[in-house]
C-alpha cells in the first residue's frame, strides 16, 4: 500500500512522535495538573459520547439537523436511506443527548439537543475546513 493511499489517521499512526531526549519528571507541573485529570468514570462517559459521534451516518444526520428541525421521513429522503436506518441512528444520538424531538400531531420532529451540541458540531466543522 502506498503512503498516498493511507488515510490521515493511518499515516499519523506510522509517524514517530517526538520524545524528550532525557526523561525528567517536573513535579510541580505534575502536582498542578493531577487534580484536573478526569476520573476513569468521566473518561468512559466521554468516550461513549464521542463514540456516538464517530459514525459517518450519524454525522450526516447531525449536519442536516444543524440546518433545521426535520422529521424522520425528511431525514431519510435527504440522506437517501431508509426510515428505519435513520431511526436507529437517531436512537443512538438521543442516548447521548445529542438530539431531541418534539411531537406535533402525528409527526415527530428532531433537532440538535442544545447550543452545546450545535457549537460542538460547528467548531469541528470549522476546524476541518482550516488549512494547515
Swiss-Prot record:
Portion annotated as DNA-binding: 72-91
Q: Which GO terms describe its molecular function?
A: DNA binding; DNA-binding transcription factor activity; metal ion binding
Give residue ranges for domain HTH arsR-type.
Answer: 38-132
The family database entries (InterPro entries) matched by this protein are listed as: ArsR-like_HTH (IPR011991), ArsR_HTH (IPR018334), HTH_ArsR_DNA-bd_dom (IPR001845), Metal_resp_trans_reg (IPR051011), WH-like_DNA-bd_sf (IPR036388), WH_DNA-bd_sf (IPR036390)
Out of the domains of life, which is the source?
Bacteria
Q: What is the effect of changing residue 116 to R?
A: Loss of ability to respond to zinc. Still capable of binding DNA
Gene3D superfamilies (UniProt xref): Winged helix-like DNA-binding domain superfamily/Winged helix DNA-binding domain (1.10.10.10)
Binding-site residues for Zn(2+), renumbered to this chain: 20, 26, 71, 73, 114, 116, 127, 130
**Keywords assigned by UniProt, alphabetized:** DNA-binding, Metal-binding, Repressor, Transcription, Transcription regulation, Zinc
Query: Which Pfam families does this UniProt record tie to the protein?
Result: HTH_5 (PF01022)
- Give the function comment from the record: Transcriptional repressor of the expression of the ziaA gene. Controls zinc homeostasis by triggering ZiaA-mediated efflux of excess zinc into the periplasm.
What interactions and quaternary structure are annotated? Homodimer.
- List the PANTHER family: ARSENICAL RESISTANCE OPERON REPRESSOR ARSR-RELATED, HTH-TYPE TRANSCRIPTIONAL REPRESSOR CZRA
Please state what the protein is called.
Transcriptional repressor SmtB homolog
Which organism does this record belong to?
Synechocystis sp. (strain ATCC 27184 / PCC 6803 / Kazusa)
